[in-house]
């Protein structure tokens, strides 16, 4: 196959119809396919200015060139990627009506079941396991004709905030290879940040989409709990788990969210009636701006470092100068949220992970008896962090401690929901820094578990309440990106997109501010 390496195309203009609204103007001049946002790639494919196969090859080239350094992927199947891309090109020739993201490649977190591709949840206990069916979200992106590039790295079973607890490799931050890409889903966000994929799927339990977005300068959205099917998603903590989009910008996340959202009878908590006009909300927000929007905020100075606190303050002033209405709100139980989350999450995880007995699926470590085989397999193939949380969760649920720990945490959860209800009676959305610090050095917190858990301070409240929340780039501190979190009322995901798109226009593209290491080739 002849490739137009590195897939440079000279374009005078792109006829992009709706995509060329004032908030999202078309590219002009010399472009690189792998550096284009998904909505523009989709428009080029539909207009036949480039083929879906050309787009796929550009990202395959990037993965092959950079993933030995980034370590975003655990598994790739480029033959499958190319087959789906060719199918899109053939269907375009026959004038078949396709989805808005047809032909746009996507990466998938390894927590999500993919038929005919390994799914390990980043754990040796599922090493080599190939599921017999697809998750609902995979069926939906398959129907949308989105070529899957591969499965992305993660902390084992989603337990971690740095992707250092993966049993296979440590994902590195494309902005600085010595730093974390966040977790648990650092692989998905790193792939988007490094232009290895225009879109990715992640899962968010307590911040596993939003924290990596913060660390890598990308967009990560946690949808309303129950709005995206969990069927076929490996369970960590069932009352928190949610699938969501990772992208380079708000509009792309909205388009992917529309593909994966919707009622699914296979998920007991799936919401039947949903407003799925997320891309329209993004268009309107980009065009209308932030004027008149009531933005709530909480003073982060007692849990954020001073540089992020200062940047957050400057961002609020900038938004106010554009017409936003600011309200400092009271959040009485904010400081208790992360503690309550970890108590409930570990209790649920200890129950969910009891199914991994090496008999039904996964490799076995043989012993003299069946019970011995189960015990030996779990002892050898679960990583230290997973075993730690299983033990803690079992302790939390044990007689004599259940009321003191688990039920007390559930009471805090109810209070957090009550706090949010009061906040949203006053404001349209709540703004917070996504995390207390920029991406930390790899190895810095791996043995300091409490410090690692505190990375989730700002992301766990929305998880406890089941609310939609997203992290978008807020700026750069010492050469590292930091995120701004937008939280909206339940089933008002469109507010995350409209507000995020408006703020995105004001803040601008932070990637031009990447540090010197990036520009001298020491990062991807």
From Swiss-Prot:
Name of the protein in its database record: Glutamyl-tRNA(Gln) amidotransferase subunit A
Sequence similarity: Belongs to the amidase family. GatA subfamily.
Statement: the UniProt record of this protein carries the keyword ATP-binding: yes
Entry annotation: catalytic residues: 109, 184, 208
InterPro entries referenced in this protein's UniProt entry, alphabetically: Amidase, Amidase_CS, Amidase_dom, AS_sf, GatA
GO cellular component, one term: glutamyl-tRNA(Gln) amidotransferase complex
Top-rank EC class of the record's enzyme: ligase
Keyword Signal: no
Reactions catalysed according to its record: L-glutamyl-tRNA(Gln) + L-glutamine + ATP + H2O = L-glutaminyl-tRNA(Gln) + L-glutamate + ADP + phosphate + H(+)
Organism name: Tropheryma whipplei (strain TW08/27) (Whipple's bacillus)
Keywords annotated in UniProt: ATP-binding, Ligase, Nucleotide-binding, Protein biosynthesis
Enzyme Commission number: 6.3.5.7
GO MF, one annotated term: glutaminyl-tRNA synthase (glutamine-hydrolyzing) activity
Top-rank taxon, per record: Bacteria
Subunit text: Heterotrimer of A, B and C subunits.
GO biological process: translation
Function field: Allows the formation of correctly charged Gln-tRNA(Gln) through the transamidation of misacylated Glu-tRNA(Gln) in organisms which lack glutaminyl-tRNA synthetase. The reaction takes place in the presence of glutamine and ATP through an activated gamma-phospho-Glu-tRNA(Gln).
Pfam families cross-referenced by the UniProt entry: Amidase
